[in-house]
Amino acid sequence: MKSVRYLIGLFAFIACYYLLPISTRLLWQPDETRYAEISREMLASGDWIVPHLLGLRYFEKPIAGYWINSIGQWLFGANNFGVRAGVIFATLLTAALVTWFTLRLWRDKRLALLATVIYLSLFIVYAIGTYAVLDPFIAFWLVAGMCSFWLAMQAQTWKGKSAGFLLLGITCGMGVMTKGFLALAVPVLSVLPWVATQKRWKDLFIYGWLAVISCVLTVLPWGLAIAQREPDFWHYFFWVEHIQRFALDDAQHRAPFWYYVPVIIAGSLPWLGLLPGALYTGWKNRKHSATVYLLSWTIMPLLFFSVAKGKLPTYILSCFASLAMLMAHYALLAAKNNPLALRINGWINIAFGVTGIIATFVVSPWGPMNTPVWQTFESYKVFCAWSIFSLWAFFGWYTLTNVEKTWPFAALCPLGLALLVGFSIPDRVMEGKHPQFFVEMTQESLQPSRYILTDSVGVAAGLAWSLQRDDIIMYRQTGELKYGLNYPDAKGRFVSGDEFANWLNQHRQEGIITLVLSVDRDEDINSLAIPPADAIDRQERLVLIQYRPK
């Protein structure tokens, strides 16, 4: 009976966090709008080999993540939930692997359930796992690889070992098809410390080639297909998207070595109090095969991405699966022997909630700021934000009432965040980061436009997805579409600032021309170097400028 209650509670938890509130949040640009539009175009064109964005070749990532996103929009429609369905599915599958792997390591159903709940409620997992990017997919394949390698090395027969390594190769191959060759580097680096400490080199060398073969066979069909269609894909993807992005001095998203320290700290909420003890206990028990394996899968990817010059918080998502298992194991030990860490965790959550309440007041219309984050007419959003932090502090307090039994309720600290964050985003943020909001405000003007030009790729993708058209033209800036715009068949998809007046004269009689520009909040739009317009509609950070036929 208790198991049934636990399962019902888990499903209710998943529904409240990962299903019910998702449609209430508008898509963010540039990431979510980009991936939403790529998948929409894939469904519309039927081209499942070459990814396109705004009708242009888009070679920044391989294809597998777009397949899953496209299936999500195919099943649930071109809406906010449909766009995010793929990442939610991948996150829940990863949680299922956490359950299975914890159960296999410790044979403890309660521990397995706690590890799953901890994983799904970690701030970084929830933030990225409900956000339409490709990282939850690669995290799933990496965690699947972690499970497959363990399965192979624990098998007692050659058939079991062979099956495990073949499965490992498939997960690595799908990882390569999702985000590239990092899906090969991370598993290798993660298993080497365990192989070395357990002296399992023989099995690795005997059966490892099976993983190589199955990985190659997984990637080969699509790899050959895109090489035939687009011969320069692999050259661009390897040199630009891997070498330049991560290793060279001009790498994207450059950050210092310690960049991931605050990411780990913030990402571990609402379980931050367990982080030091989980890592220390894992190191202290490193003679235990399972513990050192989980510790290696937590630390090695973190070190690898810390050394790389290009860094983003999403890169280390896979580390938190093994970390959640270590946290759950440590939490049960602490509850039994010394609940000090659990008490500290409760106080951390109270402090976080109270700090958030105070910070919300400071940036509210009633606070001391001259330019508050929310305006007076957005009072309900302020109360939503207060509710988010109040619930966080409340459940932090509740875990302290009988800490040996109530500590798992820390998983409910982010409940307010999950349910209310979509209702608390300030208009000033929505106007710049949510193109859907802009489209809703300017729908009547945008719909009849013959041409739409914009100076932001993220906004362009949002306009394309909302309006169901891929012919948005880039104006002044090419951004990440620079490579695709260099192809001969992309001529006419970019208009520079100097060329715009002539281009306008040539195309004005074909229909309404709409220019959507991103501007600074205090920028005077009358000073823009553009021909006089027939209509201007400013929505704070985005401006709609229209030219009608004469």
Swiss-Prot record:
Subcellular location: Cell inner membrane
Keyword flag Oxidoreductase: no
Keywords: Cell inner membrane, Cell membrane, Glycosyltransferase, Lipid A biosynthesis, Lipid biosynthesis, Lipid metabolism, Lipopolysaccharide biosynthesis, Membrane, Transferase, Transmembrane, Transmembrane helix
A cellular component annotation (GO) from this entry: plasma membrane
Reactions accelerated catalytically: 4-amino-4-deoxy-alpha-L-arabinopyranosyl di-trans,octa-cis-undecaprenyl phosphate + lipid IVA = lipid IIA + di-trans,octa-cis-undecaprenyl phosphate
Top enzyme category: transferase
Domain of life: Bacteria
GO MF term list: 4-amino-4-deoxy-L-arabinose transferase activity; mannosyltransferase activity
Pathway(s) where this gene product acts: Lipopolysaccharide metabolism; 4-amino-4-deoxy-beta-L-arabinose-lipid A biosynthesis
Membrane topology of this protein: Multi-pass membrane protein
Keyword check for Cell cycle: no
UniProt EC number: 2.4.2.43
Biological-process GO terms, alphabetical: lipid A biosynthetic process; lipopolysaccharide biosynthetic process; protein O-linked glycosylation; response to iron(III) ion
Chief site of localization: membrane
Transmembrane segments: 7-27, 81-101, 111-133, 137-154, 165-185, 204-224, 255-275, 288-308, 315-335, 346-366, 382-402, 406-426
InterPro entries: ArnT_tfrase, Glyco_trans_39/83, LipidA_mod_glycosyltrf_83
Family stated for the protein in its record: Belongs to the glycosyltransferase 83 family.
Function as written in the Swiss-Prot or TrEMBL entry: Catalyzes the transfer of the L-Ara4N moiety of the glycolipid undecaprenyl phosphate-alpha-L-Ara4N to lipid A. The modified arabinose is attached to lipid A and is required for resistance to polymyxin and cationic antimicrobial peptides.
Name of this chain's protein: Undecaprenyl phosphate-alpha-4-amino-4-deoxy-L-arabinose arabinosyl transferase
Gene: arnT
